[in-house]
């Protein structure tokens, strides 16, 4: 089996990554940064996001597992003290692969140039680079509303505990194939109205934004931030691809939610 390790880059993470590499090589595994079967992330959820975007083009062949060296992560489920146990599990234990839904983002342009396509594991956001975002919102090909405000956040179920939650969105279990649209400071008065509530769209339902012409847009996809010009539309939907995680033991989603947001530290 081929593996690679991605580290957060701090001293403790690099030390753990080096130790795991030596252990796995001793077990006869092959280090392969180009076409790994397993990607081990050592750091936090941010490190795993970087790993996902590094290998997004081979999601059917690659599975991820995380060791968190910082705060409790939603994706990184092993502690630094459990590194030897994890290595033995990888080497000797049949593992389960769990799949989570992803968000597909397609940006089309006024001048007809080639569209830009992205996959998000957590969320994608859109804001105006100059001020208030004004955009038509279409759902399933029909006009829904005209949004005016700071921006919109479109998240995956596994990303619903991140920026989406801070915006008042719902937490969605990652077994549900859906995306969620949450508003950022929408303008609502006697003249301008939005639905004013997060929207959950099931698989095969598509959301298309059609921003005001000439507006420069600041678009994020997970940790990536870009400015796009002459945007005709932005399409969001549940992606056909899924991200795959290696599981050697139960990792209950609702327990992670409770430990992160409710339980006493």
Curated annotation (Swiss-Prot):
Where is the protein localized?
Cytoplasm
Record-level GO BP terms: NAD metabolic process; NADP biosynthetic process
The entry lists its GO molecular-function terms as: ATP binding; metal ion binding; NAD binding; NAD+ kinase activity
The record's GO CC annotations read:
cytoplasm
Q: Which reaction does it catalyse?
A: NAD(+) + ATP = ADP + NADP(+) + H(+)
Annotated catalytic residues: 45 (proton acceptor)
- Cross-referenced InterPro entries: ATP-NAD_kinase_N, ATP-NAD_kinase_PpnK-typ_C, NAD/diacylglycerol_kinase_sf, NADK
- Source taxon at top rank: Bacteria
Q: What is its EC number?
A: 2.7.1.23
Q: What NCBIfam families does the database record attribute to this sequence? A: PRK04885.1 (NF003424)
Functional note: Involved in the regulation of the intracellular balance of NAD and NADP, and is a key enzyme in the biosynthesis of NADP. Catalyzes specifically the phosphorylation on 2'-hydroxyl of the adenosine moiety of NAD to yield NADP.
PANTHER family, per this entry?
NAD KINASE
Task: Write down what this protein is called.
Answer: NAD kinase 1
